[in-house]
């Protein structure tokens, strides 16, 4: 600012103060001296034209030397008390036309004044700043003369709503203060342009969004500049003479920057607590009673320092508060109320200021300590949040055993031979609900999880996939009555049970519980028994004593499941998970031996289906190898009592050899058990299990000899005219030689003679061989049996 401009400015201020030396009369304002509940603050509901600025004649600059005409201290105290009450009303409980309680988290929507107060989204920070402004400017307002008795607008009060639109800018918007053109004290020619509140350039107290580095070049101008209270309180340029005295006696901004614990590291200041700042500002207010030593020099000094201090102060405070959103500001509103004004405020910010920092402020305001909050018409935010948590827990599991099972299983299989084998087991096991014991209950207990998946408590009663009410005369069946559909549903549910059993086994292997796994083993046994019950298998040798004859419909569920290739896979997996030698293993194996022709009667052309049948035969063989003589006798009796003739083919037959494989394993296991259990030269009639075995084997041997005789007659009739070598090859290809060899250890003398006669009729046997066989006491080696 030029020296001539400063002199004109000083003369104008002196003349204005001489002509307007009247005392400030607060009683002419309608809201002074009245009850605050009955005050209707002017301007909030006024739809008229808003004044752009105040004429120069309303508020005149005055010199500090005219302080003698300020009036008594009691008037100042009354005015301060009135403004203090007004401030408490603003920040206190909710009244008509006044912003509601801070602790309530919202304000009254019914009040028209409250609606006007919410013109922008950033007014939350204005409440805290407004408290600082009112207390800082009490002395300045009390010392200003009133020029016009008709003036009813006071720009520094909290009741003027249009000033709010300007004060809202510094909540989250960076305020860019140009250093080259900014002047706190305009020249007389430009005074009218900056007298209006809409043209005032302020240094905000709580800005956000701007970034600045505290480097030496940036902080150096601050150390030489004076910290003016008018910069913080956003005072208009009319109070220029007051700024002059602040420049002479106020604390410097450089000193405050040199104290990082107060400006930077103070958590209360960064989080909306302005008590420390307010205390320091009030102390500075009492130190401003001394007049400036040289007003002319002060005016010139203020012009230079104000440009530097306010520019750097804006950048400094923008950095301090841009990355530290105050929780108290968030608590003023719920997230739902903020979202109501988000669209309008964002649109207005993008139109006026670019909208970059506004979007950042909106995102920051939506982040609260309790997480996201939702608004709905029929549900509360807690209910919506609980549903989202349930869905997230079901669809976003942190267990790699569930999310990345195939990769983890591949790693475990790849490193099976290494020392550091990865532990493949679930972090928690599935909790199965207990099934209702009431047999008369026809409705299954259905559990629906968060994702809508329906878990059946029992697979023996699958839930209907489609409910359709058909006419009684219609011959169509319900979908649940279709046999294969019900079988597929049962297979899928049974595989789910088997997966749970595998999880229990892996948990027992890698993570043994404190009780040694007794509870998990009990749970595993219950699941296996429930699956056997679901298959509806019949046990003629059950301990209940019900030894009734078998019917064709006894194993109907078992047959329907094993009709499908996936059902055979289920049976194979189930046999592999059974504990060998248990009653469940015996019951399942008896069902397999009753239906040897159904399971192993033909070899399918599909390689995968053929492999499934071969795996089923191997699984049955493993279970048989752990059976005792009683279980072996029951399985062999199941073969004899079956209504179907077993396919007694030689092992390696192209038509399928599964039945012969399991029968050979049964006969060999029985020979081992008999030798270990029954002492030699002891009568077999004393052991009931041995008697059952003898009866079962006699029936089986009779069945085997009949099959061999019929097969021999068929082969001999087809190859009667052929040579002996061709006949011998045909007999070898069709006769079950492995079954005959496995049966030799269980035959008596009559049965051995029969086998000898079959061998003689099958091919010529040398007389010397027959003589040696007779001399050996009737013991016939397997080499003697041809074919």
UniProtKB/Swiss-Prot annotation:
InterPro entries noted in UniProt: Pat1-like
In alphabetical order, the GO MF annotations are:
mRNA binding
The reply to whether Acyltransferase figures as a keyword in the UniProt entry is no
The biased composition feature labelled Polar residues covers: 105-120, 154-171, 180-198, 208-221, 355-373, 436-445
Bias-annotated ranges (Low complexity) = 142-153
Respond yes or no to whether keyword Phosphoprotein is given for this record: yes
Compositionally biased residues, Basic residues: 341-353
Mind telling me what this protein is named? Protein PAT1 homolog 2
């Amino acid at each position: 600012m030029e020296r001539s401009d400063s002199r004109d400015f000083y003369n104008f201020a002196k003349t204005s103060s001489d002509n307007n030396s009247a005392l400030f009369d607060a009683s002419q304002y309608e809201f002074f001296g009245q009850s605050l509940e009955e005050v209707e603050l002017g301007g909030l509901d006024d739809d008229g034209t808003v004044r752009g600025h105040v004429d120069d004649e309303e508020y005149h600059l005055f010199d500090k030397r005219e302080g003698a005409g300020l009036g008594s201290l009691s008037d100042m105290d009354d005015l301060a008390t009135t403004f203090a009450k007004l401030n408490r009303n603003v920040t206190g409980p909710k009244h008509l036309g006044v912003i509601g309680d801070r602790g309530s988290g919202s304000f009254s929507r019914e009040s028209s004044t409250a609606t006007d107060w919410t013109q922008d989204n950033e007014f939350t920070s204005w409440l805290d700043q407004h408290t600082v402004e009112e207390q800082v400017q009490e002395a300045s307002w009390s010392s200003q003369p009133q020029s016009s008795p008709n003036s009813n607008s006071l720009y520094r009060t909290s009741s003027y709503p249009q000033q709010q639109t300007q004060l809202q800018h510094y909540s989250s918007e960076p305020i860019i203060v140009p250093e080259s053109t900014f002047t706190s004290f305009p020249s007389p020619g430009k005074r009218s342009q900056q007298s209006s509140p809409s043209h005032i350039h302020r240094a905000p107290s709580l800005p956000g969004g701007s970034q600045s580095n505290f480097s030496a070049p940036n902080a150096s101008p601050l150390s030489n500049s004076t910290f003016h209270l008018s910069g913080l309180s956003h005072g208009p340029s009319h109070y220029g003479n007051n700024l002059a005295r602040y420049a002479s006696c106020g604390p410097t901004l450089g000193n405050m920057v040199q104290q990082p614990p107060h400006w930077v590291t103070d958590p209360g200041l960064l989080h909306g607590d302005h008590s420390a700042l307010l205390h320091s500002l009030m102390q500075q207010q009492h130190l401003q009673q001394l007049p400036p030593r040289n007003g002319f020099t002060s005016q010139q000094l203020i012009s230079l320092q104000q440009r530097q201090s306010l520019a750097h102060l804006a950048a400094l405070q923008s950095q301090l508060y841009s990355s530290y959103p105050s929780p108290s500001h968030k608590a003023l509103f719920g997230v739902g109320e903020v979202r109501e004004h988000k669209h309008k405020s964002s649109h207005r910010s993008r139109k006026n200021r670019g909208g970059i920092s506004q979007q950042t402020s909106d995102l920051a305001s939506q982040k609260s300590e309790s997480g996201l909050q939702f608004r709905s018409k029929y549900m509360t935010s807690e209910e919506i949040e609980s549903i989202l948590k349930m869905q997230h827990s079901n669809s976003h599991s942190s267990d790699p055993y569930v999310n990345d099972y195939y990769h983890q299983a591949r790693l475990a299989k790849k490193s099976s031979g290494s020392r550091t084998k990865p532990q493949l087991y679930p972090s928690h096991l599935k909790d199965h609900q207990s099934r209702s014991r009431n047999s008369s209950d026809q409705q299954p207990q259905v559990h629906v999880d968060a994702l809508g998946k329906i878990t059946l408590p029992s697979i023996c009663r699958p839930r209907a996939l489609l409910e359709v009410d058909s006419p009684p005369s219609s011959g169509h069946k319900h979908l649940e009555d279709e046999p294969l559909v019900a079988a597929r549903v049962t297979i899928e549910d049974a595989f789910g049970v088997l997966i749970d059993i595998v999880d229990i086994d892996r948990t027992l292997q890698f993570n043994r519980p404190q009780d040694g796994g007794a509870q998990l083993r009990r749970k595993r046994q219950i699941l296996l028994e429930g699956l056997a019950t679901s298959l509806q298998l019949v046990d003629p040798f059950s301990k209940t004593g019900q030894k009734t004859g078998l019917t064709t419909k006894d194993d109907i569920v078992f047959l329907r499941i094993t009709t499908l290739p996936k059902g055979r896979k289920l049976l194979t997996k189930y046999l592999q998970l059974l504990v060998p030698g248990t009653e469940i293993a015996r019951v399942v194996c008896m069902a397999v031996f009753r239906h040897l022709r159904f399971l192993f009667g033909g070899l399918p052309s599909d390689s995968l289906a053929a492999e499934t049948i071969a795996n089923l035969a191997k699984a049955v063989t493993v279970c048989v190898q752990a059976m005792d003589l009683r279980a072996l006798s029951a399985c062999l009796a199941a073969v004899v009592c079956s209504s179907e003739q077993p396919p007694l083919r030689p092992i390696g037959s192209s038509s399928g050899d599964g039945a012969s494989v399991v029968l050979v394993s049964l006969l060999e296991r029985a020979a081992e058990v008999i030798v270990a259990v029954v002492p030699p030269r002891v009568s077999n009639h004393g052991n009931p299990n041995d008697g059952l075995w003898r009866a079962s084997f006699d029936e089986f041997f009779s069945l085997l000899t009949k099959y061999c005789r019929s097969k021999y007659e068929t082969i001999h009739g087809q190859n009667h005219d052929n040579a002996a070598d061709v006949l011998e090859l045909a007999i070898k290809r069709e006769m079950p030689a492995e079954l005959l060899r496995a049966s030799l250890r269980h035959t008596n003398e009559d049965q051995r003679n029969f086998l000898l006669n079959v061998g003689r009729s099958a091919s010529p046997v040398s007389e010397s061989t027959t003589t040696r066989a007779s001399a050996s006491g009737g013991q016939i080696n397997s080499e003697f049996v041809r074919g």
